[in-house]
Amino acid sequence: MSRGTNQKFKFTYLMQVMLEKTDDEHSLTLNQILEELEKYDVTAERKSIYADFQDMTDKFGIEIIKEQIGRETYYHVGSRDFELAEVKLLIDAIQSSKFITERKSRELIKKVKSFVSEYQANQIQRQVYVHGRIKTMNESI
């Protein structure tokens, strides 16, 4: 198999794909994972992916769950640092806080949403309105 130009970043891209594209409800097959890596111009062998999954668990604490459904094997990230409910709580607190500007709120929420998969991030796209609450204009926080 020919090597892609970003081959040295294979592990990083694989970890990014697994964290962004998978969760308890969304899994990927090995072929889908390889297709996602090809978007980054990275090629990989099946066995190297398995070894990388083991390294993710051993060295970074990112548990990759393997599920057999019919004839297909699916993979997804197990537990994360923050549960979806905790991320929602943080976002609600940011949005309802009067001392954080709207711009800073958007920036913080974008960062907090990176703790969950893109599917879960889409679920928490919501606005909290506190009647009579005025956001500060002070950008120095």
Located regions from the model:
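Bulky hydrophobic/aromatic content
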Residues: D81-I141
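Short, basic/aromatic recognition patches that contact phosphate-bearing ligands
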Residues: M1-D92
